[in-house]
Regions:
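Short aromatic-enriched loop/helix-cap "lid" or pocket-rim segments at secondary-structure transitions
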Residues: 123, 175-179, 213-219
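Conserved S-adenosyl-L-methionine
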Residues: 199-210
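Short, electropositive alpha-helical surface patch
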Residues: 218-226
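Acceptor-substrate binding/catalytic loop of class I
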Residues: 38-43, 174-193, 209
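A short glycine-rich, Lys/Arg-flanked "PGG" loop and its adjoining helix->strand segment in the class I
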Residues: 148-159
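Residues lining the SAM
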Residues: 137-140, 166
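Conserved N-terminal segment of class I S-adenosyl-L-methionine
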Residues: 1-129, 133, 137, 147-150, ...
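Conserved beta-strand signature within the Rossmann-like core of class I S-adenosyl-L-methionine
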Residues: 161-167
Length: 279
């Protein structure tokens, strides 16, 4: 397996705010503007499918499960169906996401969690060592100190607990920069994150060849011409227009591409997935 550089793409995007309140507000706004794109994206659909398959294969008997970085709860819904005997919890730094997920899942525990806050261990002391399975999908690429973030997720795992982590690979698009990506990853970088958190990797997948890669290349080209760079001023109106345009494109092309994504392979792809066990 290729052990590439730690951050395989240069870190061009300014860091999102460090404080929990400011970071939460940033991602509240991102979900408001662009959250609907996730529902139409074939990449997001198949990413959730792969996560569920990995959870069932490696941790089907887990009793306590956390979806760390739950967004609006799409993955959580699929985990509920796939792991009917588990006690599920969910967390996110975005308070709007926490409230929406709690509204849709009133029987579940849903709470705000900021993996960057200095007093993380004190705030989440009751959950340290609690979960046999944690999913953390498309989260740590947003966090300036991703090593520390993964170490903190690992602290929440029970002994021999399992982490299923996903991050993007390949080059960043302008859209990635706008929504706060700090970096993208290689297989080697993902392995380093796991080992640095004292997790033993069980599987590392670079899924998506060829159709995910082609799809991501198209997104990079489209966003270069349709979106402002992160350094340019942007109005809410222009962002909403861009979001609507992308949403319409996703709805049309996503429906056509979704079946093709079943043919993607677990190598040379730009969707990185890690399964790792706590020592």
């Amino acid at each position: 397996m290729n052990r590439g550089s730690y951050a395989s793409v240069s870190e061009r995007q300014p860091a999102p705010p460090e404080s929990t309140a400011a970071a939460g507000e940033f991602y509240d706004e991102m979900w408001e503007r662009y959250g609907h794109l996730d529902a139409a994206s074939p990449a997001a659909f198949h990413r959730r499918r792969l996560i569920v398959e990995l959870c069932q294969r490696h941790a089907g008997g887990a009793r306590h499960v956390l979806d760390a970085g739950c967004g609006r709860g799409e993955l959580l819904q699929e985990l509920r169906r796939a792991l009917p005997g588990a006690e599920l919890s969910a967390s996110d730094v975005s308070l709007a996401s926490v409230r929406e997920t709690a509204r849709l899942n009133p029987a579940l525990r849903v709470f705000q969690m900021d993996l960057s806050r200095p007093d993380f261990d004190r705030v989440h002391a009751a959950d340290l060592g609690r979960f046999e399975l944690i999913t953390c999908s498309e989260v740590v690429e947003h966090i300036p100190n991703d090593r520390r973030a993964v170490e903190r997720v690992a602290k929440l795992l029970a002994p021999r607990g399992l982490l299923v982590l996903t991050v993007p690979g390949g080059k960043m698009s302008r859209f990635d920069e706008l929504i706060g990506h700090q970096r993208h990853y290689s297989s080697g970088a993902l392995l380093e994150l796991a080992l640095g958190a004292e997790l033993d990797p069980l599987e590392v997948l670079a899924w998506g060849f060829p159709f995910q890669n082609l799809y991501r290349s198209a997104v990079r080209v489209a966003s270069r011409f349709s979106m402002p760079s992160p350094s340019e001023p942007k109005s809410r109106g222009s962002s909403r227009n861009i979001s609507d345009l992308l949403g319409a494109s996703y709805a049309v092309f996503g429906r056509a591409l979704k079946p093709l994504f079943y043919l993607n392979r677990n190598f040379w792809g730009e969707q990185m997935l890690l399964v790792a066990r706590k020592r």
